[in-house]
């Protein structure tokens, strides 16, 4: 991935609920001297005094509040780790507090508490905000930008001057740690359901996570295998954000000229139409003066025009490109999906919410300021939360989306996904697959179509850290509860680092053309 660090952090926020209604131990454990296979991350900084600390009692109270309120609000806190394991983890964290705790260190402890449950939508960003403050103040970070190919962590940008560590190199060690050890440490502070989802977040902002895991460094040693097979090591110096982007601009790496956030509808000829919807939320231009991310009219006009073009073109095949799509809201994506089927449908086979005290208060406030359509998802959610007992987990009867007849498309539908098809993009792909609307091509998504999501948040009393929790559990239309991304019907590998052609798109179009030719060949004469 292109390493543009501040925008990349938005990718982490994009790993959010499929439908919007809507991490590390203390440094004094001397990990290098113990046999712990996943030693504690170093603190972002170690102040000489405790002027920038939380008192021991404040830290303990925040941790206790965190655990108590998560049990009240999280739709299923113990889904992946049972209560006994959580109890032991919280006891371990509390035992580390034997005096004032540096704020940066405590924020990492909060990350560790949240990441322990292995649910991506249960998280805090307190330590990430510390790291971003370091970057914005001119602090230096290790400029490693990476992409995964299978289990291999590959560089996708130049990280230093000279010819060592060229893009496409497979990293084998960072600071003496094997990649598996780096990932194991990262898992302690990054909320992720699966290793694939963990890696996708590391791709988005590895320099930030290295800063949190290793602490400030002037340089780190990186061992690698170059694309040609030669092994090497290099000391990669830390850089300011400005110097890092200047280095990348001075040494550009070829890549497909594609922006996944653009909205594109294009006739490719030979009966194939291409549709890249972009995010399922309003763009900056579409939000207007109100700044409303759910202002849907601009997106509606785009979709109306796109399907009018498709109808006029006489296309028999439609390719929907969801690669790199950060997701958004189902009300947007339904404008597309409803034109591809002649049957009512629901985006999930099950949708349950926990009506915790914070969630009930949040939705009571929303209901007071908004007149919800009782038949809409938001209206049904509001009613279910209001009627449920405090802390109760209740099913929401999802409204069925009705087919849209205007310029409906009844040809062959194909969807292209990758590991960065997040949130509602993964949900749309699962919906198209489960309802037999489309053939899914590409690579497995990192995000999950059966997931804990629809997040809300509360704030801790002393640190002020925002704690994000999932209030809902949704199951994909097929009913599968497997903890896995959307698996394509036709797997397609991404292109190699340094390739400017869109290899995956070319492969997809070749498969569509082959299918068209096969159908033409077998079509009986009239």
Model regions: which residues?
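Bacterial N-terminal signal peptides
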Residues: 6-16
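Boundary at the C-terminal end of the N-terminal hydrophobic targeting segment
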Residues: 18-23
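Flexible, low-complexity junctional segments that flank or bridge functional domains
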Residues: 29-318, 324-353, 361-369, 444, ...
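Short, surface-exposed connector motifs at secondary-structure boundaries
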Residues: 315-319, 408-414
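Low-complexity, serine/threonine/proline-enriched polar segments
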Residues: 353-390
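Alpha-helix-centered segments that form part of catalytic cores
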Residues: 376-411
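Extended, charge-rich low-complexity interaction segments
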Residues: 379-393, 471-487
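Extended C-terminal subregions enriched in glycine
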Residues: 412-434, 439-447
